[in-house]
Curated annotation (Swiss-Prot):
Keywords: DNA-directed RNA polymerase, Metal-binding, Nucleus, Transcription, Zinc, Zinc-finger
Note: The loss of silencing in nrpb9b mutants is due to a defect in Pol V function, but not at the level of transcription. Pol IV functions are not impaired in nrpb9b mutants and Pol II functions are partially complemented by NRPB9A.
Amino-acid positions noted as binding Zn(2+) 1 in the UniProt annotation, renumbered to this chain: 7, 10, 29, 32
Protein name in UniProt: DNA-directed RNA polymerases II, IV and V subunit 9B
Protein source organism: Arabidopsis thaliana (Mouse-ear cress)
Recorded family membership: Belongs to the archaeal RpoM/eukaryotic RPA12/RPB9/RPC11 RNA polymerase family.
Annotated S-S bridges: none
Gene name linked to the record: NRPB9B
GO cellular component labels: nucleolus; RNA polymerase II, core complex; RNA polymerase IV complex; RNA polymerase V complex
Amino acid sequence: MSTMKFCRECNNILYPKEDKEQSILLYACRNCDHQEAADNNCVYRNEVHHSVSEQTQILSDVASDPTLPRTKAVRCAKCQHGEAVFFQATARGEEGMTLFFVCCNPNCSHRWRE
C-alpha cells in the first residue's frame, strides 16, 4: 500500500487523477502543474476483519433483536437461562457456516456456538 505522495516542485500533497485520454492513473498537484504517473493503481484499500464475537459485541442488544429467531431448546451454560437467540455466520479460519447462540438473559448475554 502506498503512502501519501508529495509534489517534487512545491512539496504539496499529490492527489489521484485520471488521465482520460491515456486511461491511466496520475498523481497531480493542486498548487502547481506537476503530475506523475502512479506506480500502483490501488489508491486506497480498506480491509475489515471482525470475529463473530466482535460482531455480537457491536450488536450489544442482540438478545432483544426481534428479527432474530429464538429457541427454548437450549440452556445457557453460564446462567442456565432457557432461551437464546441464534444466527448463522462464518467463523474465522473455518469454512462453512456455524450456528451461534446468545443468551436472552439481560444480565448474562453469554455467547456460544454449535
